[in-house]
Swiss-Prot record:
InterPro entries: Domain_X (IPR024937), Maturase_MatK (IPR002866), Maturase_MatK_N (IPR024942). It is found in: Plastid, Chloroplast. This is Maturase K. Signal peptide: none annotated. Keywords: Chloroplast, mRNA processing, Plastid, RNA-binding, tRNA processing. Usually encoded in the trnK tRNA gene intron. Probably assists in splicing its own and other chloroplast group II introns. It comes from Solanum lycopersicum. One of its GO terms (biological process) is RNA splicing. Pfam families: Intron_maturas2, MatK_N. One of its GO terms (cellular component) is chloroplast. GO terms for molecular function: RNA binding.
Length: 509
């Protein structure tokens, strides 16, 4: 019982009571501004819509308004006359949300560092490597090729904003910060603006995106931590009480009656967690639960997850959000890649005395490919080509210098080769490179009021040498032995640990 309480109750180092004063510090908003610029920098080099009116003068005005306690006593029925944000309501609300998101991430960052320090003789890992999107793919390569079925799950969202506050309350023991969070959510936000459910999945509103992503991820993390705890401690929980477990599930709610009802059915459902080979991955509002079990086994997991999230976490969920697929004959959009598990047939000649025969050894392999249609769609949306992939000029860049135009196109091309370096077949990337190169030439020709052929003949082909330094040539210089031939570079898959966000061209939607 004490072991369960130690897991469910955070220690004193994880309970922070000093977060609220940070909302009045100027450097917090500077950190949030820097984070926002780095996060919103798109691979297409377009303006991401971040408000350029940010300045320390506005920060000082905002802090002065918040420091006056009379402005914090606000009627929820009279939001239009609220003097707190004044005429800059949109800008101030965005700044508060980004600053608050930067502050409340502190407890989770401390928890991450403390958990990483327990590995490899108390040596702290480089957490920025674990943040890389590409760090997920080696895990899938090592584990998914041995599994049979996978549950593709669209993660549900909470039905009320107060649930988000109650979730964060478990980790942040700071009443002032939580009151500010509750005020901000109910006064300036609503569930419709937070989550747009027009698509089968979900999407967050672009305004205050970092703030809402943090709230949503903290809530899903709470659900997942309880789920993983049940999975790892199934044999131990058979002989223990479940009061502390339910207390955490319901976030300090009144659950005396539920304890009795849940305890009766708990022994029946607990055997489901005895699967020794189970892997879970979450990404982009979706998750994957892969197992070596059979189809009936995965079907039981499906209905258990629906009941688990819907009954115990107040999440709107139905069976249509979970699909059972066989890994050997199913492809999925995963982090901008088209991933699948395919069979590679290896023929081995064996000889016994005078007789020889061939042995066919099928080997499962996790494969990642570049999706050409979504990529061309993203390029067409950014006005680099038509919907059919025919290159066109970029008129909005015609006012830039020739070097700036070439640099922008070259940077996009290098970023694409960098992100999709994990693909086993890079032929698609050379088609994208051709589109960008010809689009660059047409943009330059449009600027100089000339045709593409005339412009290249007058300027020389060396003007577009920016595109010749592709990812493969960089790899051949970095790994001369492994990349001694062009075919070896073409077939090799390289995963990087410096890619922290997905941009427009890498979005599976």
């Amino acid at each position: 019982m004490e072991e369960i309480h130690r897991y469910l109750q955070p220690d004193s180092s994880q309970q922070h009571n000093f977060l609220y004063p940070l909302i009045f510090q100027e450097y917090i908003y500077a950190l949030a501004q820097d984070h926002g610029l780095n996060r919103n920098r798109s691979i297409l080099l377009e303006n991401s819509g971040y408000n350029n009116k940010f300045s320390f003068l506005i920060v000082k005005r905002l802090i002065t308004r918040m420091d006056q306690q009379n402005h914090l006593i606000i009627s929820t029925n009279d939001s239009n006359k609220n003097p707190f944000l004044g005429c800059n309501k949109s800008l101030y609300s965005q700044m508060i949300s980004e600053g608050f998101a930067c502050i409340v991430e502190i407890p989770f960052s401390i928890r991450l560092i403390s958990s990483l320090s327990s590995f490899e003789g108390k040596k702290i890992f480089k957490s920025h490597n674990l943040r890389s999107i590409h760090s997920t793919f080696p895990f899938l390569e090592d584990n998914f090729s041995h599994l049979n079925y996978v549950l593709d799950i669209l993660i549900p969202y909470p039905v009320h904003l107060e649930i988000l506050v109650q979730t964060l309350r478990y980790w942040v023991k700071d009443a002032s910060s939580l009151h500010l969070l509750r005020f901000f959510l109910h006064e300036y936000c609503n569930l419709n603006s937070l989550i747009t459910s027009k698509k089968p999945g979900y999407s967050f509103s672009k305004k205050n995106q970092r703030f809402f992503f943090f709230l949503y991820n903290s809530y899903v993390y709470e659900c997942e931590s309880t789920f993983v705890f049940l999975r790892n401690q199934s044999s131990h929980l058979r002989s223990t009480s479940f009061g502390a477990l339910l207390e955490r599930i319901y976030f300090y709610g009144k659950i005396e009656r539920l304890v009795e009802a849940f305890a009766k059915d708990f022994q029946v459902t607990l055997w489901l967690f005895k699967d020794p080979v189970m892997h879970y991955v979450r990404y982009e509002g979706k998750s994957i639960l892969a197992s070596k079990g059979t189809f009936p086994w995965m079907n039981k997991w499906k209905f258990y997850l629906v009941n688990f999230w819907q009954c115990h976490f107040s999440m709107y969920f139905n069976t249509g959000r979970i699909h059972i697929n066989q890994l050997s004959n199913h492809s999925r959009d995963f982090m901008g890649y088209l991933s699948s598990v395919r069979l590679n047939h290896s023929m081995v000649r064996s000889q016994m005395l005078e007789n020889s025969f061939l042995i066919n050894n099928p080997i499962k392999k996790f494969d990642t490919l570049v999706p050409i249609i979504p990529l061309i769609g993203s390029l067409a949306k950014a006005h680099f080509c038509t919907g059919l992939g025919h290159p066109i000029s970029k008129p909005v860049w015609s006012d830039l210098s020739d070097s700036d135009i070439i640099d922008r196109f070259g940077r996009i091309c290098r970023n694409l080769f960098h992100y999709y370096s994990g693909s086993s077949k890079k032929k698609t990337l050379y088609r994208i490179k051709y589109i960008l190169r010809l689009s660059c030439a047409r943009t330059l020709a449009r600027k100089h009021k000339s045709t593409v052929r005339t412009f290249l003949k007058r300027s020389g082909s060396e003007l577009l040498e920016e595109f010749l330094t592709s990812e493969e040539e960089v790899l051949s210089l970095t790994f001369p032995r492994a990349s001694s031939s062009l075919w070896g570079v073409y077939r090799s898959r390289i995963w990087y640990l410096d890619i922290f966000c997905i941009n427009d061209l890498a979005n599976s939607q």
